[in-house]
UniProtKB/Swiss-Prot annotation:
One of its GO terms (biological process) is translation. InterPro entries: Ribosomal_bS16, Ribosomal_bS16_CS, Ribosomal_bS16_dom_sf. The keyword Chaperone does not apply. GO terms for molecular function: structural constituent of ribosome. Pfam families: Ribosomal_S16. Keywords: Ribonucleoprotein, Ribosomal protein. This is Small ribosomal subunit protein bS16. GO terms for cellular component: cytoplasm; small ribosomal subunit. Gene3D superfamilies: 3.30.1320.10. Belongs to the bacterial ribosomal protein bS16 family. It comes from the Bacteria.
Length: 84
């Protein structure tokens, strides 16, 4: 099954996550099919905290991809943010 989930990057105690499409059986940070955005939980000042390619996410969901619980919450936040 194809999943949209977070892949961790960044340094120790400074996490940075890529939002990726990957096979659900593959390890968290291994290769992925497509990168759809990023999430920076420790963004400061003018840094962008969350960026997603919403069009591509909708494309993958229409093809049957499942979003992880956290990505689903981030997607809802992103939609609220862009709606306002």
């Amino acid at each position: 099954m194809v999943t949209i989930r977070l892949a961790r990057g960044g340094a120790k105690k400074a996490p940075f996550y890529h939002i990726v499409v990957t096979d659900s059986r593959s390890p968290r940070d291994s290769g992925y099919i497509e990168q759809l955005g990023y999430f920076n939980p420790v963004a400061r000042g003018q840094e962008v905290r969350l960026h997603m390619n919403q069009e591509r996410i909708e494309h993958w969901v229409s093809k049957g991809a499942q979003t992880s619980e956290r990505v689903g919450k981030l997607l809802a936040d992103f939609r609220k943010q862009n709606q306002a």
